[in-house]
Amino acid sequence: MLKVGRDNVDFLDHYDVIVVGGGHAGCEAALAAARLGCNTLMLTLNLDKIAWQPCNPAVGGPAKSQLVHEIDALGGEMGKVTDRTYLQKRVLNRSRGPAVWALRAQTDKREYARVMRSVVENQPNLSIREGTVTDLVLGRNDEVVGVVTHFGSVFGCGAVILTTGTFLGGRIWIGRHWQPAGRAGEFAVEGLTDTLRQLGFETGRLKTGTPARVDRRSVDFSVMERQPGDPDLRWFSFDPEVWVPREQMDCYLTRTTPETHRIIRENLHETPVYGGWVEAKGPRYCPSIEDKIVRFADKESHQIFIEPEGRDLPELYIQGFSTGMPEKIQIQMLRSLPGLERCVMLRPAYAVEYDYLPATQLYPTLMTKKVQGLFCAGQINGTTGYEEAAAQGLIAGINAARLVQGKPLVTLPRESSYIGTLIDDLCTKELREPYRMLTSRSEYRLILRADNADQRLTPLGREWGLIDDRRWALFQAKQARIAAEIERLETQRVKAHDPAGIHLSQLTGQGIKGSATLAELLRRNPIHYADLLELGLGNEELDPFEQEAAEIAVKYSGYIQRQQAQIEQVSKQYHRPLPPDLDYHSIPTLSKESREKLAAVRPLTVGQAARIGGVNPADINALLIYLEVRQRQKTAAAAPVGA
């Protein structure tokens, strides 16, 4: 680690913001900083692998799709690129309520990377350069002032964003064999973890993995279940300019067999985890196939999805089949699956372990607490998934830009968005396994829907400087149309004896007393907006997404209002700031565990304190009472004598 004044270093060049890494977090961070007017440099190991999808070439899914919609609503890029490069789209959980609807897209991995790289390369204020960052340069006040590459080049800056993915101390494993790598064919980064430890950061190890790729020409799809895309297309981006319908490709479903399970059980000792060579925790919600066989021993079979990696590629991704087995055993496992009996493996599956920084060492702005100007985003913070990484990268990029411009840093409260929930969880909870976003992690799912992400966040994106005039005009016009339609639905009435009234009564099995508004009828099951259109009572000038937004707002208005009231009630207490100099060890009414946890995390608000593992409601009440007593004592001490 270099610790010097700015004037004592021979900088090769100087930038406002330097982003270390060119993955999904790095791209969003670099684009955000550059679009906010900062001279930005992205330093990445391999220019040909910008925005690469090293595991599943897919975007979205439960909770993850909400993240992508929110990224787009704030002015990010992931949703646009996905809409331009998808191979297939499906809405998951469609039979359930709108709070958990999830758009998922299979993407063309090479096209996705090519399009995102083009966006990055053509972004004003943004330079990209190939290089491996191995050290940081600190100023006299321990603020970050630059980075050092493997070959000794030094670049100065006002802020650094680390988006290192799985490359920090990365090792990939196939059976008993390993090599230093962040992913297959790419070098690991050594040295940077040592610097972070010297600065006093706690580090740990996590594990993930990716399945084998097989040649589609060697697969028999006729014995598998076809999984086509949805005929009615949906979009991640709220910008109609990127809505281009494309021919969709099929995915397929097969299943593990008793033979698959036998091969795995007999060879568990050959895997890095069960063999005892890797102790790092893997993702709970995306386990290896051997973990599934061990943890769910009573299950006779597991679903395996066969997914294309590209429109012009022979490679198929074997989803749900990641493993660390030796290659010879991997082939046996693959050929035990129906339809893959003669498959040719093009790339073996592997496990990868890497260094990370527990994110309790960050503020919710994603700047580290120990080093001014140093931000972290993506897998370095303990998350798993492209969408989680991109969301963090966007917020880190916004705040790095604001820091160098002398503006106050911004945060998203957990009740505002899935992004806010994600970051709050990371900065508050002690996570010892890769974190994946789930709808169950949000207390406010009905309000944090995919369809209203623009309504919730685009005004913030505009305020922060990432939503241009064209997007803002589109947003305002759309919201005006939806508001007008909701008002029409709440006021237009249908009489009981009208043909439409009779039809709707028969549909619901409930009569109409005199007359009813369209909104009242929409709240009855199973009436939907499509029924109103069929009867000539809908607004055909609205696009289907605007019609749906109006329907959801009306149909769930009571639930939404109750949840909004709950948020407002909780916010009054939970948004109360905690003094930065608060000595938790001196509060005797707190439990010992709570004192230790609060002192370690140093939460910014009462709400953040309440979400720390090991801090119970009684401790929060004790903390609130202590703050009240302290405030009264301060007020009394400040009062004039004799007053």
Swiss-Prot record:
Keywords: Cytoplasm, FAD, Flavoprotein, NAD, tRNA processing. Disulfide bonds: none annotated. The gene is mnmG. NAD-binding protein involved in the addition of a carboxymethylaminomethyl (cmnm) group at the wobble position (U34) of certain tRNAs, forming tRNA-cmnm(5)s(2)U34. The keyword NAD applies. Its cofactor is FAD. It is found in: Cytoplasm. Homodimer. Heterotetramer of two MnmE and two MnmG subunits. Belongs to the MnmG family. Its main location: cytoplasm. One of its GO terms (molecular function) is flavin adenine dinucleotide binding. SMART domains: GIDA_assoc_3 (SM01228). GO terms for cellular component: cytoplasm. It comes from Synechococcus sp. (strain JA-3-3Ab). One of its GO terms (biological process) is tRNA wobble uridine modification. The keyword Protease does not apply. The lineage of its organism: Bacteria, Bacillati, Cyanobacteriota, Cyanophyceae, Synechococcales. NAD(+) binds at residues 282-296. FAD binds at G21, G22, G23, H24, A25, G26. This is tRNA uridine 5-carboxymethylaminomethyl modification enzyme MnmG.
